Amino acid sequence: MKELKLKEAKEILKALGLPPQQYNDRSGWVLLALANIKPEDSWKEAKAPLLPTVSIMEFIRTEYGKDYKPNSRETIRRQTLHQFEQARIVDRNRDLPSRATNSKDNNYSLNQVIIDILHNYPNGNWKELIQQFLTHVPSLQELYERALARDRIPIKLLDGTQISLSPGEHNQLHADIVHEFCPRFVGDMGKILYIGDTASSRNEGGKLMVLDSEYLKKLGVPPMSHDKLPDVVVYDEKRKWLFLIEAVTSHGPISPKRWLELEAALSSCTVGKVYVTAFPTRTEFRKNAANIAWETEVWIADNPDHMVHFNGDRFLGPHDKKPELS
């Protein structure tokens, strides 16, 4: 029965118009988990629980004996669930569409149209329902994207350009850095050279929202992947300072180790480097204070007019002295 159910799941996915790499065994197992269909179940029993990726993997392991290792989670998410979402087979975070892209509570669920199709498989009018579904996919996708767009975080860059980031506390702090920190501490000669989006680091359709590779190259900054760059990079053309800003909501601040990593990566940079750790609140700052490197700066979004200076010889600016490793 297990192999029969897998074969049926793959037949449904193929009929839904998915390419071969999305009606393979992995995608078939995932569809069965999303529908909560066990080997002996009828498709009329299909449901739409809210399932994180780990729960999908657990269902497949428990009910079908297919044991995906923990490091397969990203493959399932990026090569099956993401495509299911694009094809309008699943909704992500139906319970809270504004949930952050990198939240541990992200979940996936089949939408009602797909459930209706499954309930009519294999003896009902499931093929007719699929044809109706495929006819309306473009308009369904448009409605879905419009709903997601309502929760995106708008940012007006220093040159007036408008962009938007995926929802979440981390990207909100990116917006606060641009709107609140830069006018106060960088000034009107500031130029945004890099802003990341949490969706890009998870390969979920986001992108490097701003990446001025040519300007960075002109400053002696070599090509760096998004996981090596700080979250926001701003250049003050007047003072010739490069602000390297780490936004902290879950991962760590500019610690001595991170400082040394960045110094090594930016050894060819021809301008002064100013390291800043940004926090959303004092509470978050207090949790991380012991790990912050000397000769760096701290900015807290809910007290935007002030900075905390982890240095002794100047108010703000580049430093040649290396921080002590504790």
UniProtKB/Swiss-Prot annotation:
UniProt cross-references to InterPro entries, sorted A to Z: BsuBI/PstI_C_sf (IPR041963), BsuBI/PstI_N (IPR041454), BsuBI/PstI_N_sf (IPR041962), Restrct_endonuc_II_BsuBI_C (IPR009528)
Keyword Magnesium in annotation: yes
Swiss-Prot/TrEMBL catalytic activity: Endonucleolytic cleavage of DNA to give specific double-stranded fragments with terminal 5'-phosphates
Pfam families attached to this UniProt entry: BsuBI_PstI_RE, BsuBI_PstI_RE_N
Names of required cofactors: Mg(2+)
A GO MF term: magnesium ion binding
Keywords assigned: Endonuclease, Hydrolase, Magnesium, Nuclease, Restriction system
Top class in the EC scheme: hydrolase
Gene3D superfamilies hit by this protein: 3.40.1350.80, BsuBI/PstI restriction endonuclease-like
EC number(s) per entry: 3.1.21.4
GO biological process per UniProt: DNA restriction-modification system
UniProt record similarity statement: Belongs to the BsuBI/PstI type II restriction endonuclease family.
Summary of subunit composition and partner proteins: Homodimer.
Protein name (Swiss-Prot/TrEMBL): Type II restriction enzyme PstI
Species of origin: Providencia stuartii
Taxonomic path: Bacteria, Pseudomonadati, Pseudomonadota, Gammaproteobacteria, Enterobacterales
